[in-house]
């Protein structure tokens, strides 16, 4: 029976890096993890509340770098309309920064640096592509059309290969059995440790139940 490993953890230290960068004593390590979770959860909730549409302001990842007196948070986004640094200058970013310091007590005694970076090719990121697929499936678009469109979007981002997998009752018919459908184009060398493969696993709730979505991009 095949044993599946997370492609990101498998390549950690070679082609992948940590999203949290800090050091703690062993007794304080769990507290540091909880702090990171609270920061990410607060940012996600703020953007979900303030976003303009379901396709805008999609977060790829949140990087946290903590030192003794400074907490640096970098938000990597695609199609950012909310957290823009244009006009008015950094208003929403400042609002988020203030609400983050108020909500999370351990940041209050440290300096908080918050930055937003827009991705040049958003659909080359599996997290953003996975959320796009989830939105399309929620709007009852055919899963085959969604997978083909996802492949086209990745090709425009000049990637070497993509694999998309959707699992669940995806046909849209009553009393249908759950199944797995996948589509691959190009090279996706999952067994090669030095291959820089990005991965995302997410799910979406539809009228037919929960669908699981996995995206590999090389």
Swiss-Prot record:
Query: SUPFAM superfamilies from the entry?
Result: Prokaryotic type KH domain (KH-domain type II) (SSF54814), Ribosomal protein S3 C-terminal domain (SSF54821)
For this entry, the protein name equals Small ribosomal subunit protein uS3c
Q: GO biological process: what's one of them?
A: translation
Query: According to its UniProt record, where is this protein mainly located?
Result: plastid
What organism is this sequence from?
Pelargonium hortorum
Which CDD domains does the entry link to? KH-II_30S_S3
Alphabetical GO CC annotations of the entry are: chloroplast; cytosolic small ribosomal subunit
Q: Which InterPro entries match?
A: KH_dom-like_a/b, KH_sf_prok-type, Ribosomal_S3_C_sf, Ribosomal_uS3_bac-typ, Ribosomal_uS3_C, Ribosomal_uS3_CS
Name the HAMAP family on file: Ribosomal_uS3_B (MF_01309_B)
Q: What does the subunit section of this Swiss-Prot or TrEMBL entry state?
A: Part of the 30S ribosomal subunit.
